[in-house]
Amino acid sequence: MSWQEKINAALDARRAADALRRRYPVAQGAGRWLVADDRQYLNFSSNDYLGLSHHPQIIRAWKQGAEQFGVGSGGSGHVSGYSVAHQALEEELAEWLGYSRALLFISGFAANQAVIAAMMAKEDRIVADRLSHASLLEAASLSPSQLRRFVHNDVTHLARLLASPCPGQQLVVTEGVFSMDGDSAPLAEIQQVTQQHNGWLMVDDAHGTGVIGEQGRGTCWLQKVKPELLVVTFGKGFGVSGAAVLCSSTVADYLLQFARHLIYSTSMPPAQAQALRASLAVIRSDEGDARREKLAALITRFRAGVQDLPFTLADSCSAIQPLIVGDNSRALQLAEKLRQQGCWVTAIRPPTVPSGTARLRLTLTAAHEMQDIDRLLEVLHGNG
């Protein structure tokens, strides 16, 4: 089989399964509205959960940062790319979340890959929730350590896997809020079992940070759990992009020496760090509380109105509200029907989710209004 035949076969298989991904160029894709092909849609696919991507205070901070620092960092943080803006953001994040140190990364994917690649050796074991993000599972699969997966949120199965002999260290990996189901991990129980077996806990709280808990401190804070490794990202609740790893001082020093994604990547622009500092200030303020309260009310309104639909509504109290459709083609058809009625919704299919669980991944944000939720419900009920 030639290279071209190999590529064609893979693409043909995706097409046959109604699983071929595609991108849509949009003129505006975050916030309440999505604009594509000169048409405006109510946007129920954005991860901008607090509606901060267009916040004037954050935009102003980015502009001022660009004027002060330029539009790029100029290099890796180990060379010339570690700005005083980066340092200030790291210190503010660490203080906010109760850790000694924070290290910035260009994306959540890079942060997860870097930590696992740097921490794990051949004699070690990763025990991951089987619904963990692709960045976590891919890094675990590529690492020299053993990978075992436990049934989603099943602490008993986790304990059984941890109890089996392991010559090295054990790292338990899970998410705070799961990206495709919107449910939360039982972190207190997971941490207890992990500690009983002398393991460390790594939590990716991409979809909880900024959105859940006191001052938006996230799922771990809400459940009174402090994992050894906490990954937070800035493309969701913060409305920007990037990520950080929260950890002890010694672990931070270790990652600075051995995390290749950190060492060999150009740092995020200092202007972006300034925007993130402004976003954090909003998240921690009374305005942040008001945005979280509004989002919670929108979620309650949606869940109350969707109960009698012929789909499975995932058990989620988060901004992620998946409607499990099952069949790939049916999910695509339903997403297209919603778009025709002015609601932009994305169909999520395997391999992103397990086979037979294709879904509409609906996301609600604080930028929405109650009438937007009512319109979505009207269309879902076939009255659009």
Curated annotation (Swiss-Prot):
EC number(s) per entry: 2.3.1.47
Cofactors: pyridoxal 5'-phosphate
Keyword Phosphoprotein: no
Single GO term (MF): 8-amino-7-oxononanoate synthase activity
Record-listed pyridoxal 5'-phosphate binding positions: G108, F109, S179, H207, T233
UniProt binding sites for substrate: R21, H133, T352
Pfam families: Aminotran_1_2 (PF00155)
Keywords noted in UniProt: Biotin biosynthesis, Pyridoxal phosphate, Transferase
Pathway assignment: Cofactor biosynthesis; biotin biosynthesis
Catalyzed chemical reaction(s): 6-carboxyhexanoyl-[ACP] + L-alanine + H(+) = (8S)-8-amino-7-oxononanoate + holo-[ACP] + CO2
InterPro entries in UniProt: Aminotrans_II_pyridoxalP_BS, Aminotransferase_I/II_large, AON_synthase_class-II, AONS_Archaea/Proteobacteria, AONS_Proteobacteria, PyrdxlP-dep_Trfase, PyrdxlP-dep_Trfase_major, PyrdxlP-dep_Trfase_small
Record-listed N6-(pyridoxal phosphate)lysine modification sites: K236
UniProt keyword Glycoprotein, yes or no: no
Highest taxon listed in the record's lineage: Bacteria
One GO BP annotation of this record: biotin biosynthetic process
Protein purpose: Catalyzes the decarboxylative condensation of pimeloyl-[acyl-carrier protein] and L-alanine to produce 8-amino-7-oxononanoate (AON), [acyl-carrier protein], and carbon dioxide.
Database matches in PANTHER family: 8-AMINO-7-OXONONANOATE SYNTHASE, CLASS II AMINOTRANSFERASE/8-AMINO-7-OXONONANOATE SYNTHASE
Subunit structure, interactors included: Homodimer.
Protein's UniProt name: 8-amino-7-oxononanoate synthase
Organism this protein belongs to: Escherichia coli O157:H7
